[in-house]
C-alpha cells in the first residue's frame, strides 16, 4: 500500500526564487519572439501588396503602349531575299547615312555647274571663262578678215624655202612666152633661167639675159643676190633675146 501511494503521487521538488524568475523570464522572451514574428509577417504582407500594385501599374503601362502601337500604321515586313539580318542592317544603315549626306551637301555644286554652262554657251564673250582665247593682233594681217588668220613667223625662212618672183620681158622680135611671171627658189642661179628660156623658145641658139636692160649676169650668180639689189615692185625684171642686144 505504501508503495502504490508513492507511485501515484508525483514527487514535487521545491523551486528556489531564482529558478522561478528564470522560468518567468523565458516565458516573457517567448512572447516577445512571437510578437516580432507577427510584425514580420505583416511587413511581408505589405511588401507583397506593393509588388502586386507595381505589377498591375506596369501592366497598365504596357497595355497603354501596346494600344498605341496597335493604333499606329502597320509596318511592312522587310524583304530579306535570302540575305542575312546583319547584311540587311548594314544596307539600311548605309542608306540612312547616304540620305543624311545628301541633305547636308552644300548647294555650291549646282551653282558652279550652272555658271560653267552659262559661260561656255556665250561664244562671243572674250573673257577667260568663255573658253576661247582672244585672237592675237600679231596673227592678223591688215586687209584680211578675222577668219583668215595666219600664223606669225617665229623664225625667218631658210634659203631653200624663200621664193623669188621673176618677170620676163622679150627684146625686139624675140618670141613672147606665156606666162611672163614665174616664181623660183631664191638659192637657184642664173643658169637655170637660161635653160628654162631655151626650152620655152625651142631654140638651139644661145639665149642672152639682161638685168635692168643694162648688163648681162653671169650664169653662176644667185637669184637672191640679184633680187635684193635690183628688184622692182617685189619682182626681178629679166630681159631676154636670142642675140646680143647690148654692148
UniProtKB/Swiss-Prot annotation:
The primary site where this protein sits is: membrane
**This protein's superkingdom?**
Eukaryota
Question: Glycyl lysine isopeptide (Gly-Lys) (interchain with K-144 in ATG5) crosslink - at what positions?
Answer: 247
Q: What does this protein do?
A: Ubiquitin-like protein involved in cytoplasm to vacuole transport (Cvt), autophagy vesicles formation, mitophagy, and nucleophagy. Conjugation with ATG5 through a ubiquitin-like conjugating system involving also ATG7 as an E1-like activating enzyme and ATG10 as an E2-like conjugating enzyme, is essential for its function. The ATG12-ATG5 conjugate functions as an E3-like enzyme which is required for lipidation of ATG8 and ATG8 association to the vesicle membranes. ATG12-ATG5 rearranges the association to the vesicle membranes.
> Where, per UniProt, does this protein localize?
Preautophagosomal structure membrane
State the GO CC annotations: Atg12-Atg5-Atg16 complex; autophagosome membrane; phagophore assembly site membrane
Q: Does the keyword DNA-binding apply?
A: no
The record's GO molecular-function terms, alphabetically, read: Atg8-family ligase activity
- Matching InterPro entries: Atg12, Ubiquitin-like_domsf
- Which keywords are on file for this protein? Autophagy, Isopeptide bond, Membrane, Protein transport, Transport, Ubl conjugation pathway
Under what name is this protein listed?
Answer: Ubiquitin-like protein ATG12
Residue ranges, compositional bias (Polar residues): 50-66, 146-158
| GO BP, sorted A to Z | autophagosome assembly; autophagosome maturation; autophagy of mitochondrion; glycophagy; piecemeal microautophagy of the nucleus; protein transport
Task: Give the Pfam families listed for this entry.
Answer: APG12 (PF04110)
Asked if Coiled coil is a keyword of the record, the answer is no
Family of this protein: Belongs to the ATG12 family.
Q: Where is this region: Disordered?
A: 1-158
Q: Which Gene3D superfamilies match?
A: Phosphatidylinositol 3-kinase Catalytic Subunit, Chain A, domain 1
Q: Where is the composition biased (Basic and acidic residues)?
A: 1-11, 39-49, 96-106
Q: How does it assemble?
A: Forms a conjugate with ATG5.
Q: Where are stretches of biased composition, namely Low complexity?
A: 107-130
Amino acid at each position: 500500500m505504501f508503495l502504490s501511494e508513492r507511485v501515484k503521487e508525483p514527487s514535487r521538488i521545491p523551486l528556489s526564487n531564482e529558478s522561478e524568475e528564470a522560468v518567468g523570464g523565458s516565458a516573457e522572451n517567448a512572447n516577445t519572439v512571437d510578437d516580432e514574428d507577427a510584425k514580420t509577417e505583416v511587413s511581408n504582407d505589405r511588401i507583397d501588396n506593393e509588388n502586386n500594385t507595381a505589377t498591375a501599374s506596369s501592366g497598365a503601362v504596357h497595355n497603354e503602349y501596346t494600344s498605341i502601337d496597335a493604333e499606329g500604321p502597320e509596318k511592312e515586313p522587310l524583304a530579306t531575299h535570302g540575305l542575312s539580318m546583319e547584311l540587311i542592317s548594314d544596307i539600311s544603315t548605309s542608306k540612312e547615312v547616304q540620305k543624311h549626306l545628301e541633305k547636308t551637301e552644300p548647294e555650291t555644286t549646282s551653282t558652279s555647274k550652272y555658271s560653267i554652262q552659262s559661260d561656255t554657251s556665250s561664244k562671243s564673250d572674250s573673257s577667260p571663262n568663255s573658253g576661247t582665247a582672244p585672237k592675237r593682233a600679231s596673227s592678223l594681217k591688215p586687209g584680211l578678215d578675222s577668219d583668215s588668220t595666219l600664223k606669225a613667223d617665229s623664225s625667218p625662212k631658210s634659203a631653200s624655202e624663200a621664193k623669188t618672183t621673176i618677170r620676163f620681158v622679150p627684146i625686139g622680135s624675140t618670141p613672147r612666152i606665156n606666162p611672163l611671171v614665174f616664181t623660183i627658189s631664191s638659192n637657184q642661179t642664173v643658169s637655170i633661167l637660161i635653160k628654162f628660156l631655151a626650152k620655152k623658145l625651142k631654140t638651139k641658139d644661145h639665149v642672152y639675159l639682161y638685168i635692168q636692160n643694162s648688163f648681162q649676169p653671169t650664169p653662176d650668180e644667185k637669184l637672191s643676190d640679184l633680187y635684193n639689189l635690183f628688184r622692182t615692185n617685189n619682182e626681178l625684171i629679166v630681159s631676154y633675146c636670142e642675140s646680143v642686144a647690148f654692148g
